[in-house]
Amino acid sequence: MRFVLPKGRLLRGSLEILRRAGYEIDEPGERRLIQRFNGNEVLLARAFDVPVYVEHGVDVGITGSDVVEERGSDVFVPLDLPFGKCRLSLAMPRESVTPPEDMDGYRIATKYERITRNYFSSLGVEVEVIKLSGSVELAPKVGIADAIVDIVETGTTLRANGLVEVDKVMDVSAQLLVNRISQKTKFDEINSLVLAIKEVVKDGA
C-alpha cells in the first residue's frame, strides 16, 4: 500500500497510531519525502495536499478533518482519530464583537475559504472572504478584515492579538482517508489497517 502522511503538527500522532497498529514506520527526514517499509511506501506531504493525493491514487492518508472539509475531495473517511483535536472558530476584535447573523457585508480573513462561505451561507449572511495562507490573526489588526476564521487550540494566539471567539464553526480532529478505488481493489489490506487502528483507538491511543 501507499500511505501519505502530513508534515507538521499531525505527523507525530500519525506515526504513533500506525506503529501501535503494527505498521513500523520510521520518521521521514525533511529531505526524505518517500520511504519504504515491508513492501509499502510512505509519502510526506503538506497537510492540505493529503486529500488530493488520496483522491488521485494514493491508498491511505491521514490529515485534519478541517482540511478534508475545505478540500471537498472525493475520499472515503472510515475513522476519526484521537489526536489533532482543536476547533475552527470565528473570531474578531473584542471591542467590535458582533453576532454572526449580523455580519452582512463583513470581510472575513481565512485560509478556509470553502468552509467559511458555507458557514455564512447557512446563516443567510453574505460576506467577503479574503483568502490568506498564514498569520490570519493579523488581518483585523491591519484593517484588511473585520473578523477571521481560523484554527484554535488554546486561544493564546487570539488573546495575544486582541481577538475573541464569537462562534465555533466546527470541531477538528485527525482523520483516516482511503482512496475509493483502493477501498475495493485492496479491500483486505485496507480492512486490516482500519480494524487495527480501531483497536488502538478503543484501547486509548
Curated annotation (Swiss-Prot):
Protein origin, superkingdom: Archaea
Gene3D superfamilies the record matches: Periplasmic binding protein-like II
- Output the Gene Ontology cellular-component terms: cytoplasm
* Reactions catalysed: 1-(5-phospho-beta-D-ribosyl)-ATP + diphosphate = 5-phospho-alpha-D-ribose 1-diphosphate + ATP
- Which CDD domains does UniProt cross-reference here? PBP2_HisGs
GO BP, one annotated term:
L-histidine biosynthetic process
Question: Which Cys residues form disulphide pairs?
Answer: none
Localization in the cell? Cytoplasm
What's a Gene Ontology MF term here? ATP binding
Q: Which residues form a coiled coil?
A: none
Q: What is its EC number?
A: 2.4.2.17
Tell me yes or no: is Transferase among this UniProt entry's keywords: yes
Q: What class of enzyme is it?
A: transferase
Instruction: Read off the InterPro entries from this record.
Output: ATP_PRibTrfase_cat (IPR013820), ATP_PRibTrfase_CS (IPR018198), ATP_PRibTrfase_HisG (IPR001348), ATP_PRibTrfase_HisG_short (IPR024893)
* Biological pathway: Amino-acid biosynthesis; L-histidine biosynthesis; L-histidine from 5-phospho-alpha-D-ribose 1-diphosphate: step 1/9
Sorted alphabetically, the keyword list is: Amino-acid biosynthesis, ATP-binding, Cytoplasm, Glycosyltransferase, Histidine biosynthesis, Nucleotide-binding, Transferase
- Physiological role: Catalyzes the condensation of ATP and 5-phosphoribose 1-diphosphate to form N'-(5'-phosphoribosyl)-ATP (PR-ATP). Has a crucial role in the pathway because the rate of histidine biosynthesis seems to be controlled primarily by regulation of HisG enzymatic activity.
Q: Which PANTHER family match?
A: ATP PHOSPHORIBOSYLTRANSFERASE, ATP PHOSPHORIBOSYLTRANSFERASE ATP-PRTASE
Give the family from UniProt: Belongs to the ATP phosphoribosyltransferase family. Short subfamily.
Q: What is this protein called?
A: ATP phosphoribosyltransferase
